[in-house]
Each structure stands twice: as structure tokens, then as C-alpha cells.
């Protein structure tokens, strides 16, 4: 009797478990149907009835502080395709018009279908086949486009530069990658975004908002015209233009001074902190990173041993030189190491224990104001020497160094300035442990 009851309980458990599994499977199948089958069917039905054509906005322009136009747009044309609409055609003729080989054609089609490279791929949705055709190339293709079903021309704009200067400040734009598409739903395969400089920092301001034009198809898939006379179209919104703090005349002059040299020049308006010019040398003409040769030219810049893509004012760490002297003087005064009347002798440089900083000839000895006026290379090393070696003020050398560093940090040394350009590196302020290594 007990065995029979146990058997019935086990049977009920089995039936109940089977029912639960069945319900879960039904739920999963329903989700699959709703998310995959129905969405694909809807995309198929929509693509049969309509062509939703993206309208790309004009990117915002850039001006310098005086109102000079620096960056603007010019028309360009992309070749788009809807994969399911492609029918047999003369690929040789098509390739000759676009100046590509048949092998390149086949590879482009394969890359479009590759969801690893193109996560947003759908045979119902327009895909980028070739970008940035010139007006002449577009005209030739437009005349024969009827021979190539599934392909159409997409109007775009590309950047143009009024001056061959400030490449690393202005930045450049390039095609978005998979990560960009996954992180921002605004982008689709073939879109462009700012990759460096101001173009990157102000991408969301400059790019604008896309629009859409809905075109009606007939039963054969041919475009009949705008759906309901454009009632449902959404016009694009142009990007916002920017007025920079840069003075292009100063920028160009700085680049001229730095030609065939390694280094940088930064000019700052003291009252506002605005950057008037930021020169990095060597540099390059920003116009070489537009058009279909962008990839080739960018690769050449990357391989250049002089590193023209390296923004030295932002990324390199250089000794501050004589610009550091006023800071040193303030620290010495604050700590009571010197007074405004304290003088140091300059024997054409700081030679204590083999010191290296040489100095030009000037009256000696000098107080602080005179040392700043003549940029003396002896006064400030002697001041630091007296501060570090003063056991009356600081019990140890280490404590003296730490106090010195605290003053520097309090004035902003060792921090990023927070300029609106990507890639900035912070400065290095040594402490006593750093000098213990020597």
C-alpha cells in the first residue's frame, strides 16, 4: 500500500514537472516568435512597402576667436545597398565605375553580411557599400544606377579645412566601429564620429540629429515617390557650430617657428585661461585625413618615427624651465627661506657640487625681483638648497621636500588642467622618495 502511494506521488511529480517544462518551452517559443519571426516579418513587410532613407545633418562648423572659418563641410556621396533587393547585374561595369576590382566587390559584400564586423546588419535595411564618392564619380554612377537594382546614392557631407594648421587641436572624424555602435544607438554602420581633438570632445554638439525620408514602393519594389507627400518625414537638424579660443594667425605662426623641430608651444590668455595656440611639432595638414585615402594616410602617420599624431603639449612630460621660477620664488617667500631683499651671487650659473645650470652674464648679486627679471639660473637653485638644508625649519630633508611638494600641489602642479581636448596627461611632481634613488 505504501509503495503504491509512493508511486502515485512520484507520478504526479513527474507530470507536474513535465507541465512546467512544457510551459517554459512554450514561453520561450513565443518570445522567439515575437522578437525574431514577427520582427523579421515586419521588417520584410516594411521594406516591401517603404524605403526609409536616412537624412544626414550637416556637421557644425568651427571658427577661431576672431571669427575666421576653420572647418566646414562639402557634399559627398555614399553608395548604399539593400541586400534583399539586389538582382543579377553586370558587376564588371559596376566595379569599373567605382574603380574597384571584382575581388574587392566580393569582399565588401561579405564584410557587410558579417555580423561580427557589422552587428546591425539586416538584408532589409540599407547598408553602406562605398563611402565618399566625388561629385564626378556620383554623376557617372547616377546615370547607370537603374542597371544596378538594390543600390542607391546617399547624400553626405565631409569635412574641409580652410588652413593646413592646428590638426591635433581641431581633430578629425572617422568611421564608427562596433564598440561605438553598441555604446550609442545614434550610430549605424558607415556613420562618422569625431575621433580626436575638438571633433571628439564636442561630438554630440557637432554631429546634429539625423532625419528620415520615407519613400513609397510599388508592387515591384520601385520607388514611386514620397509617402503621403512627406507627411511622416523628419528633417535633419544641423550640428551646432563652435567658436574656439584659438587664434589661427598665432597658431600658424607658432607652427612656422617649430618647423623641423620637436616640441610644442602653448599660449594662454592669463585673465581667462583661454588657449590662444597649441602647437605640436611635427604636425600634418588635417586635409589628408579626409576622403577615401584617409586610412592609408593615417597608417603612414602612425608609422612615422617622429610621431606627428602625438600631441606633445597635452601628452608629453617636459621640464617646466624658467616658467617655474616665479613658483619657486613664492614658495621660498612663504616658507621664510628668503625675503624680498635676500640676494644670491651668480657666477655664470649654479655650480655647487657640480651643478649644471649655466647662466648668462648679468649684474650680481641679485634679489628676487632682479633674478626674475633676468631669469637667473643660480638664484633659484640656491633658494631650494637653503630650504632643503635648513634644519631650523624642517627636522629632516624628507620633510623639507614634502613641504615643497605640498606647495606645488596646492598651486595645481601634478594635476590635469582639464582642457577640453582628449588625451591630456598630468604633470609629474617628484617627492623625497624619488630623489632617494639618486
Predicted regions and their residues:
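Periplasmic/cell-envelope proteins involved in peptidoglycan metabolism and beta-lactam response
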Residues: 1-293, 317, 400-410
Amino acid at each position: 500500500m505504501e509503495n503504491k502511494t509512493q508511486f502515485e506521488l512520484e507520478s504526479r511529480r513527474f507530470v507536474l514537472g513535465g507541465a512546467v517544462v512544457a510551459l517554459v518551452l512554450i514561453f520561450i517559443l513565443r518570445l522567439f516568435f515575437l522578437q525574431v519571426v514577427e520582427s523579421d516579418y515586419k521588417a520584410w513587410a516594411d521594406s516591401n512597402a517603404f524605403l526609409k532613407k536616412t537624412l544626414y545633418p550637416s556637421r557644425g562648423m568651427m571658427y577661431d576667436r576672431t571669427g575666421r572659418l576653420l572647418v566646414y563641410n562639402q557634399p559627398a556621396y555614399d553608395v548604399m545597398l539593400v541586400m534583399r533587393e539586389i538582382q543579377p547585374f553586370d558587376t564588371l561595369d559596376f566595379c569599373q565605375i567605382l574603380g574597384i576590382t571584382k575581388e574587392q566587390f566580393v569582399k565588401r559584400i561579405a564584410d557587410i553580411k558579417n555580423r561580427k564586423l557589422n552587428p546591425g546588419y539586416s538584408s532589409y535595411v540599407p547598408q553602406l557599400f562605398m563611402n565618399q564618392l566625388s561629385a564626378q564619380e556620383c554623376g557617372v554612377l547616377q546615370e547607370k544606377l537603374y542597371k544596378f537594382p538594390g543600390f542607391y546614392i546617399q547624400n553626405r557631407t565631409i569635412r574641409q579645412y580652410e588652413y593646413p594648421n592646428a590638426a591635433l587641436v581641431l581633430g578629425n572624424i572617422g568611421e564608427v566601429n562596433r564598440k561605438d555602435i553598441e555604446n550609442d544607438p545614434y550610430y549605424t554602420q558607415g556613420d562618422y564620429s569625431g575621433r580626436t581633438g575638438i571633433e571628439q570632445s564636442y561630438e554630440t554638439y557637432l554631429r546634429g540629429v539625423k532625419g528620415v525620408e520615407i519613400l513609397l514602393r510599388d508592387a515591384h519594389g520601385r520607388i514611386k515617390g514620397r509617402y503621403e507627400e512627406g507627411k511622416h518625414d523628419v528633417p535633419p537638424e544641423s550640428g551646432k557650430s563652435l567658436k574656439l579660443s584659438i587664434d589661427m594667425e598665432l597658431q600658424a605662426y607658432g607652427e612656422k617657428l617649430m618647423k623641423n623641430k620637436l616640441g610644442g608651444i602653448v599660449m594662454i590668455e592669463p585673465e581667462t585661461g583661454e588657449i590662444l595656440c597649441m602647437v605640436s611639432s611635427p604636425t600634418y595638414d588635417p586635409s589628408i585625413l579626409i576622403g577615401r585615402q584617409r586610412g592609408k594616410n593615417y597608417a603612414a602617420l602612425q608609422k612615422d618615427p617622429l610621431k606627428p599624431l602625438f600631441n606633445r603639449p597635452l601628452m608629453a612630460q617636459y621640464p617646466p624651465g624658467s616658467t617655474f621660477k616665479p613658483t619657486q620664488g613664492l614658495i621660498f617667500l612663504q616658507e621664510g627661506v628668503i625675503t624680498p631683499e635676500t640676494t644670491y651671487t651668480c657666477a655664470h650659473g649654479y655650480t655647487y657640487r657640480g651643478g649644471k645650470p649655466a647662466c648668462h652674464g648679468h649684474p650680481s648679486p641679485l634679489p628676487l625681483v632682479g633674478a626674475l627679471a633676468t631669469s637667473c639660473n643660480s638664484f633659484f637653485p640656491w633658494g631650494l638648497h637653503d630650504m632643503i638644508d635648513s634644519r631650523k625649519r624642517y627636522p629632516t630633508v624628507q620633510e623639507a621636500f614634502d613641504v615643497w611638494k605640498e606647495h606645488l600641489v596646492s598651486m595645481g602642479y601634478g594635476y590635469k588642467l582639464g582642457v577640453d581636448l582628449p588625451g591630456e596627461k598630468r604633470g609629474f611632481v617628484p617627492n623625497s622618495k624619488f630623489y632617494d634613488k639618486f
